[in-house]
């Protein structure tokens, strides 16, 4: 099998210099432990949700063995909101697909920001926050 070599600056997130030295990793079954594709019509809706919300998991431990990541979709009905919560040591990224998101955060949820279609929201570890659908009539659709 040919040796795979990283191309210089091939990806904007590649902050490691290319190298040719061997790694002391155990053998990997790339067929089963490599790239995974989860079709959009096969998301798992059997995940905890707040009333007025529909969550569907795409990437998590149960689906693909992810250790530090949860990704999926959420639909929040008009005027619905989550309870105040945080995600422990994990960071979160939310991409707004449709609708208007209102985020509240802080010890007493005293800070507020809004985001619309095409906007990204970053939530740092341990930050208490609440997601709110800011519209009284439209659903809010996001990818997390």
Q: What does each model-found stretch correspond to?
A:
Residues 73, 86, 105-107, 125, ...:
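Residue-level recognition of conserved beta-strand positions in structured domain cores
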Residues 63-64, 89, 108, 136-137:
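Short strand-connecting beta-turns/loops that link adjacent beta-strands
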Residues 81, 87-117, 127:
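A short beta-strand-loop-beta hairpin characteristic of the jelly-roll/cupin
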Residues 54-60, 72-88, 125:
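Conserved short histidine dyad/triad with adjacent acidic residue
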Residues 2-68, 83:
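A short, N-terminal "cap"/entry segment at the start of jelly-roll beta-barrel domains
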Residues 114-117, 125-144:
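Ligand-binding loop in jelly-roll beta-barrel domains
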Residues 68-70, 90, 139-140:
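A structure-centric signal for secondary-structure junctions around beta-strands
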